[in-house]
From Swiss-Prot:
The modification 4-carboxyglutamate is found at E17, E21. This is Osteocalcin. Gamma-carboxyglutamic acid residues are formed by vitamin K dependent carboxylation. These residues are essential for the binding of calcium. Ca(2+) 3 binds at D23. Belongs to the osteocalcin/matrix Gla protein family. The modification 4-hydroxyproline is found at P9. Ca(2+) 2 binds at E21. The gene is BGLAP. It is found in: Secreted. Residues 1-40 form the Gla domain. Sequence data obtained by MS from fossilized bones of about 21 thousand years old. Keywords: Biomineralization, Calcium, Extinct organism protein, Gamma-carboxyglutamic acid, Hormone, Hydroxylation, Metal-binding, Secreted. The carboxylated form is one of the main organic components of the bone matrix, which constitutes 1-2% of the total bone protein: it acts as a negative regulator of bone formation and is required to limit bone formation without impairing bone resorption or mineralization. The carboxylated form binds strongly to apatite and calcium.
Length: 42
């Protein structure tokens, strides 16, 4: 198992991990900006 620092072991790649990264960006700069940066859309 791999520990991704989330406090729990994950036996597989979390399919929601990219969304979590977007959520973290959204907390810092706002959702629309985070979405645009991550997906490359306006």
């Amino acid at each position: 198992y791999l520990d991704h620092g989330l406090g729990a072991p994950a036996p597989y790649v979390d399919p929601l991990e990219p969304k979590r990264e977007v959520d973290e960006l959204a907390d810092q700069m706002g959702f629309q900006e985070a979405y645009r940066r991550f997906y490359g859309t306006t």
